[in-house]
């Protein structure tokens, strides 16, 4: 599914926990729909049976490699079930995390960056990937009183390693970095500007 034809736009927001991804993703979808576009919010990892089984029945076997392959399969099904049909129907799909989350988190857990990238080599490439950069202390402070699906990833030293991998991916030109330590409205304006610029280049 690495190269398909579609008339929509695939937008991904990445960042450590507490960077504001979910809030800004939903703000963006609401705004785009208000402007007359067709926009849809989605997220990864999904709530598929695959992820839940590995986190449950097979949790004792989890490591960076098992997680990377689990999330890659979850991603493929997510693409086939939801993302690609929406893109072909002309939607702007805004995904709260995608394959670069797997690269960052599984590399921070011990898998080589390039191996995780290779595992995801044939995943559909986003049209726009925005990394919301915030220091781990700020991110985890924001998440302090919020429920989380993956508490094992919310440890300060681990969050620092995750951020280092994200910054390496930015350096490789795979993502656009936006300072997310500012008020949410300021961060959102910058994100919206990037997406509207990308939309202006989509053939009509």
PLM feature spans:
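NTP-dependent small-molecule kinase module
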Residues: 2-4, 29, 137-204
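Pre-Walker A (Motif I) flank of P-loop NTPase domains
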Residues: 6-10
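Hydrophobic anchor at the beta1->P-loop junction of P-loop NTPases
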Residues: 13
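ATP-binding Walker
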Residues: 18-19
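Walker A/P-loop
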Residues: 22
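ATP-dependent small-molecule kinase phosphotransfer cores
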Residues: 35-121
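A glycine- and Lys/Arg-enriched "phosphate-lid" helix/loop adjacent to the NTP-binding pocket
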Residues: 102-164
